[in-house]
Amino acid sequence: RPNWEERSRLCGRDLIRAFIYLCGGTRWTRLPNFGNYPIMEEKMGFAKKCCAIGCSTEDFRMVC
């Protein structure tokens, strides 16, 4: 289990689990249109950043 006070490098399954743990639950909603590319690109950039340099709890809160 990563220490959420510091940056942790999370890739693949670990990133997905952390995202669900921190952002999941009743707050989740479906995107009404998958053509909303700016949001999708932002999420992909977040995933690449977490894998390359790591991310903190605060980083997750900005994309939840």
From Swiss-Prot:
Belongs to the insulin family. This is Relaxin. GO terms for molecular function: hormone activity. One of its GO terms (cellular component) is extracellular region. Disulfide bonds join C11-C51, C23-C64, C50-C55. The keyword Disulfide bond applies. It comes from the Eukaryota. It is found in: Secreted. Keywords: Disulfide bond, Hormone, Secreted. Heterodimer of a B chain and an A chain linked by two disulfide bonds.
